[in-house]
């Protein structure tokens, strides 16, 4: 998108869906992402005349609620928009964050998105740059060392694993 000079809402909204699909194809799931991005852009133009700055004038709670009303935007995407685009101090919880925390026993396996997010926000200063960097580091550790098959022996967080190894989900009851 950067190479095609399409980083503005106006430029993206003017594209036909097929054009946008081709541009974001390398990101994977391009058809679904195209629909969701178009839903966001349509909302932005219908309610805020295409102005992200006007949308971002809303308080964080209201902005998050409005983002969650858009078809295809869930908590992780809404919080990513809040943190990375609107520069709001809200912690993003993704698969890697969950996996790293739960395997180290730092949070219960049953913890949902809101519980994990509240854990971070209760223990870190509300600083968007800190949240951004912390999340990026967890994603990196998760991607490189804590995938579906863990590589604990190489992980920089290995020394903080429980003595008996990674925590696993409780057994499913019949």
Residue ranges and their predicted role:
Residues 1-173:
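Catalytic cores of DNA base-excision repair glycosylases
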